[in-house]
């Protein structure tokens, strides 16, 4: 072999190794952030996100703070940006607290999406949304109304915090629907469990003790709903209607024992999966506009809606909402069909 030919082969080999290295480095990395870890609802969403990552050959990292805090989420966002992640999908604990960190991420070319709980729309590109506030707030009231069969009733709201975006939007719509359609219902209290199982149980027991003639607890939160059910069992209160949002695996024993007649949610595994599919499409094909559709394996087709479906005034190119195809009412007849 001549020296010239040897140098040529060596050069081609080096270029090939460099190309392989570049391809490895170019693999998409997507961060999927819950409000906090250790809660079944968020774990299920993370499972859906990671399932999508496998289907798309994308590296999906699921991580969140141990307590729901702006500082904890901001630290994770900054870490993922500094590590070179291509997209961040976050369930926001605050509508505006994450905005400075998310805007910095977007300025550095990172695709920013929200899921489950939104930020202000200018702080992200797309929100993967389980349902509009009107849909979910109405769902809460309708579930309660099917059990509270009287014109005058006492109702309590119980959920995670006074600042979390999604739940406060639903509750606002639910209270408006009560005022319009059930004017005889009195909302006697609105209390919070702050995503803590022990505090949630204590708060729920406190509500039931303080309002012994309570007709319904509306608990649109994955910790608050099972806490309300457990509190009713602990206090042997079988007269209060308990409705809200949580996962079927958590609520199954309460439904089977009859403590909870029905509750609602959406397929959070699908929500996680849809979130990653949308992020992947953005990274590979660029921004989507209102009306654009995306086919998702095992789910079907989703569509980009304007921010106005969530009640926002803000609209911009490359910005919108992707609604989940459906929401689910769980009861004793159908809960066995679901495992998440």
Swiss-Prot record:
One of the protein's GO biological processes: transmembrane transport
**Which positions make up the signal peptide?**
1-26
Is Cell inner membrane one of the keywords UniProt gives this record?
A: no
Task: Note the Gene3D superfamilies from the entry.
Answer: 3.40.50.2300
Has the keyword Repressor been applied to this entry? no
Keywords annotated in UniProt: Periplasm, Signal
Location relative to the cell: Periplasm
**Which cellular components does GO assign to this protein?**
ATP-binding cassette (ABC) transporter complex; outer membrane-bounded periplasmic space
Domain of life where this protein originates: Bacteria
Matches recorded under Pfam families:
Peripla_BP_4
Q: By its UniProt entry, which NCBIfam families does this protein fall under?
A: PRK15408.1
Q: Which family does it belong to?
A: Belongs to the bacterial solute-binding protein 2 family.
**What name is this protein filed under?**
Autoinducer 2-binding protein LsrB
Organism equals: Escherichia coli O139:H28 (strain E24377A / ETEC)
Q: Which gene encodes it?
A: lsrB
